Amino acid sequence: LPLCKGYCMAINPLWRKTASQWVRQIDLWGRKHNFVAIRLSDIFFDFQSVYGDVNLAIELRNQVAKMIAANHFYLSAMFSEIADHNVALGFFGGFITDDEEQEFKGQINLKHTGTLPMVEAIRLLSLREAITEAATLSRIEALHLKGILDETERETLAAAFELLTGILLDKQISDFKEGKHVGYHVDPETLSGRQQKRLTEALKIIDDLRKRVKSEFTADIF
């Protein structure tokens, strides 16, 4: 497995702390409100326990969830950092493809303009509600149980996430088998007409979610 390009690994002292040290670190990031602090805490919020005393992770997540939910200025700053992370859907409903790099011309970066905008929006709503779930689908379910998402929203958002991750995973598996670079770009022309329609609908659902989050965190409806 390739090492994390951002050096977000246990061999980096920044990401190797005791529970009490993590609480102090999150408190510091929460008071700074700058780009680096928000980006690092954004990564931290999705942590999951994989080894050792699971209760340590549970207690830490509960404590951090309460800290962030009470920090409205920080939540607003978090939204500001992700405000321009839009989906790959144009004003008239067509796909917005990557035309900057010749290698990916006509393709969609399904992570940066698909799953990422959704993950960020769901994470932000979950942090505001002090939800301790880390996985996106689990967060959607928790938001539904709290009454933040209705039944239709729960179903459509979960379906949209599963569709995007499914398309992306299929492409990555195919590229790996063919010895190609495994990345996040997908050519919509390689999808069936039905898949293209479903992808368009999924991106529209995510775009609507982001508009809602923008309205709730900035009171701006445009």
Regions found by a protein language model. Name each.
Residues 1-222:
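A nucleotide- and high-energy phosphate-metabolite-utilizing enzyme signature
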